[in-house]
Amino acid sequence: MILDMFRLDDKVAVITGGGRGLGAAIALAFAQAGADVLIASRTSSELDAVAEQIRAAGRRAHTVAADLAHPEVTAQLAGQAVGAFGKLDIVVNNVGGTMPNTLLSTSTKDLADAFAFNVGTAHALTVAAVPLMLEHSGGGSVINISSTMGRLAARGFAAYGTAKAALAHYTRLAALDLCPRVRVNAIAPGSILTSALEVVAANDELRAPMEQATPLRRLGDPVDIAAAAVYLASPAGSFLTGKTLEVDGGLTFPNLDLPIPDL
């Protein structure tokens, strides 16, 4: 049956930034598809709430509260997953982000910090996870969460957009290095209604122009990204590697225009 190809029965996944937003949605979707999940983020209470939902779906959950802005901390999650569940099949590098700023106010340290948070953490966990995937499962799948800002240009996103563009290309490079036993793909979300857009969601004057600028005339839901992640992690996506799925409502130009004046 075709739907069976989207199952993740008895797989083990690590998801960074799994306490809320996209990470929480992906964790719950993986559990509903049959996977056990290690979720990691900074806030224990958020992790506990997501873990409760995973267990309610009939799967095991393990939580790690840590500051994942540091690659050396993120790298430890792979071994913790094997310690908790006995193996590791899937990694979702979801943690990341950088606050918008004008180009002339963006320092070289800001660029380096954005790269470390968005690319360095993904690389550290991937390098730690792959040997364990090979040892315990014979292979696996890595999914990196990039962004449309890694493809489109908008004012205020020099550091963030550059880092997410690097993550998308890192995905292509890692896929070639790790084939054929480990697949590496990315998802580039558009404007998704998470806490990062809570101000937009509550204000029709802000939300309506963003929806109008999106060809599908709506903003995304975290489940849109979760569904793409299930596809990439499951046998249904077994012939994809090195690709970035653009789950953005059809954007060809940014739908968020920060009030940054002309020079």
Swiss-Prot record:
Cellular component terms (Gene Ontology): plasma membrane
Active-site residues per Swiss-Prot or TrEMBL entry: 160
GO MF term (any one): oxidoreductase activity
Pfam families for this protein: adh_short_C2
Residues that bind NAD(+): 17-41, 164
Keywords assigned by UniProt, alphabetized: Oxidoreductase
Sequence positions that bind substrate: 147
EC number: 1.-.-.-
InterPro entries (alphabetical): NAD(P)-bd_dom_sf, Sc_DH/Rdtase_CS, SDR_fam
Organism domain of life: Bacteria
A GO biological process held by the record: symbiont-mediated perturbation of host innate immune response
PROSITE patterns, per database record: ADH_SHORT
PANTHER family: OXIDOREDUCTASE, SHORT-CHAIN DEHYDROGENASE/REDUCTASE FAMILY (AFU_ORTHOLOGUE AFUA_5G02870), SHORT-CHAIN DEHYDROGENASE_REDUCTASE FAMILY PROTEIN
Family to which the UniProt record says this protein belongs: Belongs to the short-chain dehydrogenases/reductases (SDR) family.
Protein name, as recorded: Uncharacterized oxidoreductase Rv0927c
Organism: Mycobacterium tuberculosis (strain ATCC 25618 / H37Rv)
Species classification: Bacteria, Bacillati, Actinomycetota, Actinomycetes, Mycobacteriales
